[in-house]
């Protein structure tokens, strides 16, 4: 795999970006009434993160054993895990960016069952321990680009999805891969109450083409910053597809099903004119309500370093993935 030449040490999102006192952060950002002229969805959640009292951090996960392949590393320092994952979209636990960290402790992640089924020769089931022991784990520093036009760079820990799918032996009929989040309304308030959960239909579902799922970049993720994922980041296992918008990164997965037909996806069902199936990061295809040409990068340095920067096609991974979409109209297939 070609080493990612775009990342440098200053690009890594410092963990100090999370759990800062909100008055300090607002002052550092220079947020004012003028900022409210921006498209609502592009700024409202950023503001909502800072309102109310500080929330306690979720318990730290257990340390993981993993390698650091040079193709995914830049000798970047990591900061303590107790300051990570305070700015999340996980509507099952609420709409504010701070809600998942405050509320996701209710999610029971052990025991856990992940089933692989559908168009496969060998259906299989993984339990909680399998997720961290069945495959060698590796740390990968990836960009993460939210459809809301903000971005981070995060050191995820996991294993390539293609290794898991290979064990199940996809049949020649398999064309797509469908994913499903756990449905546990007694643990996830957003699944109980449509107001809390943003009016989405649950359980959350996502999908990829089989060739996208088999790409070496596509990661089944079980950890971050050296330890097991905290609940608000999608414990015990989530998907990371770094060239796509973050909503494709389905969390707390319990089912992977290989299918002949393209599977439904949650945000496409909710607003098909705004959220496509492919969801490839593309500065030339705007969201109907805001531009995707630039993004707010939440980075390292000082109290909080948030800078506007150009959005990269395929989130900077064009050299690796553009060939997947040769001949495909990226405006029509957004």
From Swiss-Prot:
Function: Part of the MsrPQ system that repairs oxidized periplasmic proteins containing methionine sulfoxide residues (Met-O), using respiratory chain electrons. Thus protects these proteins from oxidative-stress damage caused by reactive species of oxygen and chlorine generated by the host defense mechanisms. MsrPQ is essential for the maintenance of envelope integrity under bleach stress, rescuing a wide series of structurally unrelated periplasmic proteins from methionine oxidation, including the primary periplasmic chaperone SurA and the lipoprotein Pal.
EC number: 1.8.5.-
Catalysis performed (reactions): L-methionyl-[protein] + a quinone + H2O = L-methionyl-(S)-S-oxide-[protein] + a quinol; L-methionyl-[protein] + a quinone + H2O = L-methionyl-(R)-S-oxide-[protein] + a quinol
Assembly with partners or alone: Heterodimer of a catalytic subunit (MsrP) and a heme-binding subunit (MsrQ).
The protein's name in its UniProt record: Protein-methionine-sulfoxide reductase catalytic subunit MsrP
Domain of life according to the entry: Bacteria
Entry-linked InterPro entries: MsrP, OxRdtase_Mopterin-bd_dom, OxRdtase_Mopterin-bd_sf, TAT_signal
Cellular localisation: Periplasm
Organism of this sequence: Shigella sonnei (strain Ss046)
Cofactor: binding details: Binds 1 Mo-molybdopterin (Mo-MPT) cofactor per subunit.
Classification via PROSITE patterns: TAT
Cofactor (UniProt): Mo-molybdopterin
Main subcellular localisation: periplasm
Pfam families: Oxidored_molyb
Taxonomic path: Bacteria, Pseudomonadati, Pseudomonadota, Gammaproteobacteria, Enterobacterales
GO terms under cellular component: periplasmic space
Secretion signal, residue range per the UniProt entry: 1-44
């Amino acid at each position: 795999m070609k080493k990612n030449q775009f990342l440098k040490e200053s690009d890594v999102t410092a963990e100090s970006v999370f759990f800062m006192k909100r008055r300090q952060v607002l002052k550092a950002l220079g947020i004012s009434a003028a900022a409210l002229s921006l498209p609502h969805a592009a700024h409202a959640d950023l503001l909502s993160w800072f309102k109310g009292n500080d929330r306690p951090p979720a318990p730290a996960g257990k340390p993981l054993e993993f390698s650091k392949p040079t193709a995914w590393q830049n000798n970047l320092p990591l900061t303590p895990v107790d300051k990570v994952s305070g700015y999340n979209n996980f509507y099952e636990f609420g709409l504010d960016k701070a809600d998942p960290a405050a509320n996701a402790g209710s999610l029971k992640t052990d025991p856990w069952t992940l089933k692989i089924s559908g168009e496969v020769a060998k259906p299989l089931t993984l339990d909680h321990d399998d997720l961290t022991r069945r495959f060698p784990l590796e740390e990968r520093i990836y960009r993460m680009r939210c459809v809301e036009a903000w971005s981070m760079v995060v050191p995820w820990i996991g294993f390539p999805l293609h290794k898991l799918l290979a064990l199940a032996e996809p049949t020649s009929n398999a064309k797509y891969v469908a994913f499903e989040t756990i449905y546990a309304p007694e643990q996830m308030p957003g699944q109980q109450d449509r107001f809390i959960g943003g009016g989405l239909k649950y359980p959350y579902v996502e999908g990829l083409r089989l060739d996208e799922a088999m790409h070496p970049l596509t990661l089944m993720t079980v950890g971050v910053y050296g330890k097991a994922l905290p609940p608000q980041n999608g414990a015990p296992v989530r998907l990371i597809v770094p060239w796509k918008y973050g909503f494709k990164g389905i969390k707390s997965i319990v089912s992977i099903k290989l299918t002949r037909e393209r599977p439904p996806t949650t945000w496409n069902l909710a607003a098909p004119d705004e959220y496509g199936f492919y969801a490839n990061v593309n500065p030339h295809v705007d969201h109907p309500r805001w531009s995707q040409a630039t993004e707010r990068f939440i980075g390292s340095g000082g109290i909080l370093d948030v800078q506007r920067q150009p959005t990269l096609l395929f989130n900077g991974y064009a050299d690796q993935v553009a060939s997947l979409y040769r001949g495909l109209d990226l405006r029509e297939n957004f």
